[in-house]
Amino acid sequence: MDYAKTIVNELGQTLSSISERNTENLIDMIEGADRVFLAGCGRSGLMVRGFAMRLMHMGKKVFVVGETTTPSINQQDLLIIASGSGETGSLVAMANKCKKIGASLATVTIFPQATIGKLANCVVIIDAPTAKSQQKTAITSIQPMGSLFEQSLLLYFDSII
C-alpha cells in the first residue's frame, strides 16, 4: 500500500505543476474549434480515447485520429496530440500535416522543445520524468517508463472537462 501512496503523491506533485494559463488556453481552443481531433500512441493513445469520450458526452464533435470513421481535418478544427517525448514519428507527421492545412495544434507533453512542441499553438507541459529524460526535475518517480506521464494525462484531461 505504501507503493500506491507514493504514486498518488507523485501524481499530486505532477498535476500541481501544470500551468493554469496554458490549461485555460487549451480549454479556449477546444471551445472555439468546430471539431476536436485527438492523437496519441501506446498508453497515451488510450488516455486520449477517454478524453474523446468525455468531450463527446459534452456535445463536442470529436474524433480520434486513425479510426475508420475519422474525417479529414480542416482550418476550423483543433488537433490535440498527447506525446511524452514529442518526437513519435507518426505524431510528428500528423502535427506537420495539421500545420500545413492551417488547423490549430495543441500538445500535452513532457518536452516542450521537441518537434511537436515547436509546431504547436499551445503546449501543456506535464513534468513527469521518465527513464529516457535527462532533465533534472523536482519530481521523481518510482514507476517504470512513462507511467507517471500517462496517469497524469488521464487525470489532467478529466480535470479540464
Predicted regions and their residues:
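Short, compositionally biased "basic patch" segments
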Residues: 1-4, 41-45
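Hydrophobic packing residues in well-ordered alpha-helices of helical domains and bundles
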Residues: 4, 23-26, 48
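Glycine-rich phosphate-binding loops that contact phosphosugars or nucleotide phosphates
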Residues: 37-41, 47-155, 161
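A short N-terminal beta->alpha junction/helix N-cap motif
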Residues: 14-18, 39-42
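A short, well-structured juxtamembrane/interface segment
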Residues: 17-32
